[in-house]
From Swiss-Prot:
Protein name per UniProt: Leucyl/phenylalanyl-tRNA--protein transferase
GO molecular function per UniProt: leucyl-tRNA--protein transferase activity
NCBIfam families associated with the record: aat
Entry keyword annotation includes Membrane: no
The UniProt record lists the keyword Metal-binding: no
EC number from the UniProt entry: 2.3.2.6
Pfam assignment, any one: Leu_Phe_trans
GO cellular component terms attached to this protein's record: cytoplasm
Keywords: Acyltransferase, Cytoplasm, Transferase
GO terms, biological process: protein catabolic process
Function: Functions in the N-end rule pathway of protein degradation where it conjugates Leu, Phe and, less efficiently, Met from aminoacyl-tRNAs to the N-termini of proteins containing an N-terminal arginine or lysine.
PANTHER family: LEUCYL/PHENYLALANYL-TRNA--PROTEIN TRANSFERASE (PTHR30098), LEUCYL_PHENYLALANYL-TRNA--PROTEIN TRANSFERASE (PTHR30098:SF2)
Subcellular location: Cytoplasm
Annotated organism of origin: Cereibacter sphaeroides (strain ATCC 17023 / DSM 158 / JCM 6121 / CCUG 31486 / LMG 2827 / NBRC 12203 / NCIMB 8253 / ATH 2.4.1.) (Rhodobacter sphaeroides)
Gene name of the encoded protein: aat
Amino acid sequence: MKPPALTPRLLLRAYALGIFPMAESRDDPEIHWIDPRHRGIFPLDGFHISRSLARRIRRMDWRVSVDEDFAATVEACADREETWINPTIFRLYVELHALGHAHSLEVREGETLVGGVYGVTLGRAFFGESMFSHRTDASKVALAFLIDRLRAGGFTLFDTQFLTPHLASLGAIEIRRSDYHQRLTEALEGNASFTPEGYWADPASVVQRNSQTS
């Protein structure tokens, strides 16, 4: 019996159960479902902005945007020697974006996309999928603006899937699967907005708000 076709709705049900899809490589047509024993998360009050990053944000001439070019952000995340984003996964996230359940935050230098992050939203949970950086600190800037936005929008869970040394240096932690599922259940019981009404994120305010909570 053939497995059911992978659709955006099926993907959302998987996220609600705490599992997410990955491919072995760009050319691997198979989709593997992952439920790690230990899960990486970003405590929304624990993002660490170093002095150098704070200076970078305050003085930056980059522009931060949201959902201006979701597909290009995913493509940039996949544009590396090894990637888990195959054509099927790319298509699914673009379809989730059209449904309002996937968003991108972009960092631009002029009109050039130099950094960004994208993920899936469900209830009060944000599932970070991937990020990229074509300039020094561009992905860190994207994360700082993303976390500020998630807090303002009422999110309670930022799932990073795995914990990397880079994420750990910025304040991400690792928790057990059982703890993660409990937090996920609680996050799914409410609603949040990725585009909260009246929200404004100028660089100085982002640094100040992150400094007050970290």
